[in-house]
Amino acid sequence: MVSRYRRPALTTPKRRAERLSLWLVAALIGAVAFQAAASGRQASALRPYTAEYKTTARGFDLSVTRKLEADDNNHFILTNGGKILVVGFHEISVFRVEDEEIRSISYIYQGTGLVNRRQELHFDAEPGKITSLYKDQWYDLPDNGSTLDRMNQMEQLRLELLQDPASVDDITLRIADGKRLKDSQLVLIGEETQHTALGPVATLHYERLHDDPDRKSDIWLAPQWDYLMVRMVHIEDGDPVEMVLTGATLDGEVVAIQ
């Protein structure tokens, strides 16, 4: 059965740019690799990387760069950013890994140019509480210690796959986003080959479930590259945003087809 999506109503250039910026952020669900400075089995599986993606939205192309590093405090710093015409963005997620789970510390999104919007999440202000900046207002959200941000949520999936790939058919993650908490559910569709600028890549295909029938999100992860994301497609109101990997380094080595 073919899904059908209604076309959005006409909007102003500023509103279109704002929606495009938000779609790009939604597309960048991820955050994609770690370096663990701590010792142990899970630390050895997590490695730093830099990845370049070609992102296409409404006929426009832009390059998006993601980078994952670790500091001397055993914190992981994941950055994400790109620019198209008069719209740009930069994101940073800071977290640590404890007991095979990501523990969020902070998240900041900064829009630039026409859409100068800022969002923040702070997970360590007080025990059991997240402070969130959304549309120039601060909100308090409950935290159970495992709440993620919209960037590092994909890292939790990767982490579990790296530890036991046979056990992750689907996963539900608790996400703090704006003034609310929500559950993000990812379901394994199967194994697929994706054709990229690097050549054909064997991947695992996951679908993100949405309550809204006008939204659809799919991601493809490469097991041979520590489950690095090689493709993502997000559709909202019939308008797709697609990201495809064009190049990457993993633990300082250029990735290549094996």
Outline where the language-model segments fall.
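Hydrophobic, well-structured mid-protein blocks that either form specific transmembrane helices
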Residues: R117-L162
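Intrinsic disorder/low-complexity segments
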Residues: F34-A37
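Bacterial N-terminal signal peptides that target proteins for export
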Residues: Y5-L24
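Acidic, serine/threonine-rich low-complexity disordered tracts
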Residues: G40-A125, P165-Q258
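Bacterial N-terminal signal peptides
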Residues: W23-V32
